[in-house]
């Protein structure tokens, strides 16, 4: 499907009843071709989506609410365009269902069909809302480095290694900003880079991250671009790149890519989320 046909950036009426046809898949392969990524990926990963505005009607017409976390595997053929996902979830608002399991069954079936692979789903009931925590990404934050920046489109040539022996460290920043490729709206994120290898020059990394500031690309694609650029520039033996983007339309998206870790960290939202 062409992005020109996606609901993002268009005036679309909110649905009144359940409609799985609202989901708009976008092939991952299209963007990955520009990153020189083929069928064999240099990483594993997931895209963690948190839905904060999930509601439906029970069999007697009484509203129910919950939150949910969806895990889209990075090797699925498609991502789902975010506005279409929001509209799809909102199509349950006036839909009667016998129980929460019926909702779960529809979500799992429909999202797997759109993504082209099984999608993990975790429900969070109102009884558990009080258990939810908030925390910042761990790591050494590089935001206070005293540097001058004048590049605001992705510039992988900025990346470089620093002198020194091999290290194992985690670096983090709250200064990642990219833009929606359809609407131009800003996308804000915290970024974590965990690696083992030659030291990454921290000032160079910060300049590189900031260079995304006027770049238009989906969240998932930005993280894969960052992963590939760091691998080519510094060739770490181990690398994980993880971004937590702020919420839009009741959804936040948190892509995680790694060539050595088997599972992402706990899905804990940051203060800005």
Curated annotation (Swiss-Prot):
Which keywords, in A-to-Z order, does the entry hold?
A: Cytoplasm, NADP, Oxidoreductase, Queuosine biosynthesis
Q: Which GO terms describe its cellular component?
A: cytoplasm
Which terms does the UniProt entry file under GO BP? queuosine biosynthetic process; tRNA modification
State the active site.
180, 187
Question: Which residues of the sequence carry a binding annotation for NADPH?
Answer: 82-83, 248-249
Which Gene3D superfamilies does its entry note? 3.30.1130.10
The cellular location(s) given in this protein's UniProt record come to: Cytoplasm
Question: Highest taxon of the source?
Answer: Bacteria
> EC annotation?
1.7.1.13
Q: Provide the binding site for substrate.
A: 80-82, 219-220
Under the heading SUPFAM superfamilies, the entry gives: Tetrahydrobiopterin biosynthesis enzymes-like
Family label = Belongs to the GTP cyclohydrolase I family. QueF type 2 subfamily.
Name of the featured protein: NADPH-dependent 7-cyano-7-deazaguanine reductase
Gene name as annotated: queF
